[in-house]
Amino acid sequence: MIDINLLEKLNAPTAQQRLDNLKAILADIDFPPTVPQYINNHIHTTYSFSPYSPTAAVFAARMEGLCTAGIIDHDSISGAREFLQAADLIGIPATIGMECRVSMDGTRVAGRRTNNPDQVGVSYMTIQSVPHHNIEKLEEFFKPYRAARNERSKKMVANINALLPGVKLDFDRDVLPLSLYSEGGGLTERHIMYSLALKLTAQTGKGAAMVQRLEDMGLTLSEKQKAQMMDTQYPFYEYDLLAILKSAFVPRIYVDADEECPSLKDLVKLCKEVDACLCYAYLGDVGDSVTGDKKAQKFEDDYLDELFLCLEEEGVRAVTYMPTRNTPEQLTRLRSLCDAHNMFQISGEDINSPRQSFVIKAMENPLFANLIDATWKLIDHEREGKALPI
């Protein structure tokens, strides 16, 4: 996490203010050397959910020694132009994209759980390496889907109010202002949980009182979580609380996504029209979570071979994955299937909380050199129109 005072300047209310503040900061900053292996193509910003504006995200990535940076937001690419301008000012190559959930109805894996912990029949996919002249076309396509998602979010807020009578959340007053929806940003379950975290903190305070409140709500906290709740001086206290609430309450208040999920057929067509790279985001079964932040759950591993046949049939030609999040056995199998089906492999590990590092240490392993090379292919495609291997 960058210095809190710098972050506040780089999170100023408007993009122009943020970029102007960046110019002033750059006059007095010394960046560490870049590391050729440090790439990350999946950095969230305030245009979905993150402590970082697009400008702050690029700055933070460069401060950690990344040699490239990539923006990915939920249902939105509205932060991309600011991200690119900040990258130009800092002098770091950048790639842009977004992610969304896709209905798998009509495919051979319809009705199955793939990479979505909350819902069967709906898969997460990323749209990578978007040519810059097509940003607005992509943004316009997702505008009605964002509106539909808001309607579902209102139902989940109502579910919270029914589940927790002492909490009265109002979508328009408490949740919507936490997002950049009015500027084309996406509103997610994390915004809802963050709103709940703010409400609980306002009602209860921090420290022992919060620990007791959560236990009274039926939550069993780990020692790590208790320590976080006792750290009343941490400037992002509500982010830690959000993580606790998300795990405990999203399964209880979740409403299935429907109208906000384009069909896979429509998304494949869109990506061809805008000349972007559509990627299936591999998750893999979670046993003992590599990162310790996911419960044990089955995902796509039992029928991964069939899923690859589905992707090939439907016109998806790339897979993105996170080496830090999977076991060596999962990665070996996945990479073999990518080779067998001629799938372009890319990588990025989602950044959406202040405790996360932007660095993917796994990239230091020569085994993943292809993922570094792929990142430069994404950048060259955006900048110069070079064809991707898809």
Feature map (PLM): residue ranges:
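Extended substrate/RNA-proximal surfaces in nucleic-acid metabolism proteins
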Residues: M1-D30, D88-D301, K377
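Active-site mouth loops of central-metabolism enzymes
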Residues: N40-Y52, S289-D302
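Amphipathic coiled-coil/heptad-repeat helices and related helical stalk/stem segments
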Residues: S53-P54, E260-L264, Y303-L304, Q330-L331
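Substrate-recognition/cap regions that form aromatic- and gly/pro-loop-enriched pockets
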Residues: C271, C279-D285, D293-T320, N326, ...
